[in-house]
Amino acid sequence: PYEKIGAELVKEVAKKTDDVAGDGTTTATVLAQALVREGLRNVAAGANPLGLKRGIEKAVEKITETLLKSAKEVETKDQIAATAGISAGDQTIGDLIAEAMDKVGNEGVITVEESNTFGL
Protein backbone atom coordinates (compact mmCIF):
# COMPACT_ATOMS: atom_id res chain seq x y z
CA PRO A 1 0.00 0.00 0.00
CA TYR A 2 2.85 2.45 0.76
CA GLU A 3 4.33 1.94 -2.70
CA LYS A 4 1.05 2.93 -4.34
CA ILE A 5 0.79 6.05 -2.17
CA GLY A 6 4.39 6.94 -3.03
CA ALA A 7 3.82 6.38 -6.75
CA GLU A 8 0.70 8.56 -6.71
CA LEU A 9 2.59 11.27 -4.82
CA VAL A 10 5.46 11.24 -7.33
CA LYS A 11 2.97 11.35 -10.22
CA GLU A 12 1.25 14.37 -8.66
CA VAL A 13 4.60 16.12 -8.13
CA ALA A 14 5.51 15.64 -11.80
CA LYS A 15 2.11 16.88 -12.98
CA LYS A 16 2.19 19.92 -10.70
CA THR A 17 5.74 20.77 -11.81
CA ASP A 18 4.74 20.53 -15.46
CA ASP A 19 1.62 22.66 -14.88
CA VAL A 20 3.47 25.39 -12.97
CA ALA A 21 6.91 25.46 -14.60
CA GLY A 22 6.56 23.47 -17.81
CA ASP A 23 9.98 22.00 -17.14
CA GLY A 24 11.87 20.15 -14.44
CA THR A 25 9.59 17.13 -14.14
CA THR A 26 12.51 14.69 -14.10
CA THR A 27 14.26 16.58 -11.31
CA ALA A 28 11.01 16.89 -9.35
CA THR A 29 10.32 13.17 -9.77
CA VAL A 30 13.80 12.17 -8.57
CA LEU A 31 13.55 14.50 -5.56
CA ALA A 32 10.04 13.28 -4.69
CA GLN A 33 11.13 9.66 -4.96
CA ALA A 34 14.06 10.32 -2.62
CA LEU A 35 11.81 12.14 -0.13
CA VAL A 36 9.31 9.28 -0.10
CA ARG A 37 12.01 6.60 0.20
CA GLU A 38 13.90 8.38 2.98
CA GLY A 39 10.69 9.41 4.73
CA LEU A 40 9.45 5.83 4.85
CA ARG A 41 12.87 4.63 6.00
CA ASN A 42 12.90 7.18 8.82
CA VAL A 43 9.34 6.37 9.90
CA ALA A 44 10.19 2.65 9.91
CA ALA A 45 13.15 3.50 12.15
CA GLY A 46 10.82 5.26 14.60
CA ALA A 47 10.83 8.89 13.47
CA ASN A 48 7.69 10.96 14.02
CA PRO A 49 5.93 11.41 10.64
CA LEU A 50 4.60 14.84 11.64
CA GLY A 51 8.09 15.92 12.66
CA LEU A 52 9.41 14.80 9.27
CA LYS A 53 6.62 16.71 7.52
CA ARG A 54 7.41 19.88 9.47
CA GLY A 55 11.10 19.50 8.68
CA ILE A 56 10.40 19.09 4.98
CA GLU A 57 8.12 22.14 5.01
CA LYS A 58 10.81 24.25 6.71
CA ALA A 59 13.40 23.05 4.20
CA VAL A 60 11.12 23.89 1.26
CA GLU A 61 10.52 27.35 2.71
CA LYS A 62 14.25 28.00 3.12
CA ILE A 63 15.14 26.66 -0.33
CA THR A 64 12.41 28.75 -1.95
CA GLU A 65 13.62 31.85 -0.13
CA THR A 66 17.23 31.20 -1.19
CA LEU A 67 16.28 30.58 -4.83
CA LEU A 68 14.16 33.73 -4.99
CA LYS A 69 17.04 35.79 -3.52
CA SER A 70 19.47 34.48 -6.12
CA ALA A 71 17.04 34.74 -9.07
CA LYS A 72 17.78 37.35 -11.71
CA GLU A 73 15.32 39.05 -14.02
CA VAL A 74 15.86 38.22 -17.68
CA GLU A 75 14.98 41.40 -19.56
CA THR A 76 17.20 42.15 -22.53
CA LYS A 77 17.14 40.33 -25.85
CA ASP A 78 20.71 39.13 -25.25
CA GLN A 79 19.80 37.77 -21.81
CA ILE A 80 16.76 36.00 -23.25
CA ALA A 81 18.89 34.51 -26.05
CA ALA A 82 21.53 33.30 -23.59
CA THR A 83 18.97 31.80 -21.19
CA ALA A 84 16.93 30.17 -23.96
CA GLY A 85 20.11 28.85 -25.59
CA ILE A 86 21.18 27.18 -22.35
CA SER A 87 17.70 25.76 -21.79
CA ALA A 88 17.46 24.42 -25.35
CA GLY A 89 21.05 23.24 -25.44
CA ASP A 90 21.46 25.13 -28.71
CA GLN A 91 22.35 28.81 -29.06
CA THR A 92 20.74 29.07 -32.50
CA ILE A 93 17.41 28.06 -30.98
CA GLY A 94 18.03 30.53 -28.15
CA ASP A 95 18.55 33.31 -30.69
CA LEU A 96 15.34 32.34 -32.53
CA ILE A 97 13.37 32.38 -29.28
CA ALA A 98 14.78 35.79 -28.35
CA GLU A 99 13.91 37.14 -31.80
CA ALA A 100 10.36 35.79 -31.55
CA MET A 101 9.93 37.27 -28.07
CA ASP A 102 11.28 40.60 -29.27
CA LYS A 103 8.71 40.64 -32.08
CA VAL A 104 5.64 39.73 -30.00
CA GLY A 105 6.54 41.76 -26.90
CA ASN A 106 5.88 41.00 -23.23
CA GLU A 107 2.19 40.30 -23.69
CA GLY A 108 2.55 38.32 -26.92
CA VAL A 109 2.09 34.61 -27.43
CA ILE A 110 4.51 32.30 -29.21
CA THR A 111 3.25 28.96 -30.48
CA VAL A 112 5.79 26.25 -31.26
CA GLU A 113 4.72 23.43 -33.53
CA GLU A 114 6.53 20.43 -34.92
CA SER A 115 7.50 20.78 -38.57
CA ASN A 116 9.08 18.65 -41.26
CA THR A 117 10.75 21.74 -42.70
CA PHE A 118 14.27 22.25 -41.36
CA GLY A 119 15.20 25.78 -40.34
CA LEU A 120 11.72 27.26 -40.05
Curated annotation (Swiss-Prot):
It comes from the Bacteria. It is an enzyme of class 5 (isomerase). Disulfide bonds: none annotated. InterPro entries: Cpn60/GroEL, Cpn60/GroEL/TCP-1, GROEL-like_equatorial_sf, TCP-1-like_intermed_sf. It is found in: Cytoplasm. The keyword Isomerase applies. ATP binds at D23, G24, T25, T26, T27. Forms a cylinder of 14 subunits composed of two heptameric rings stacked back-to-back. Interacts with the co-chaperonin GroES. Belongs to the chaperonin (HSP60) family. This is Chaperonin GroEL. It comes from Mycolicibacterium rhodesiae.
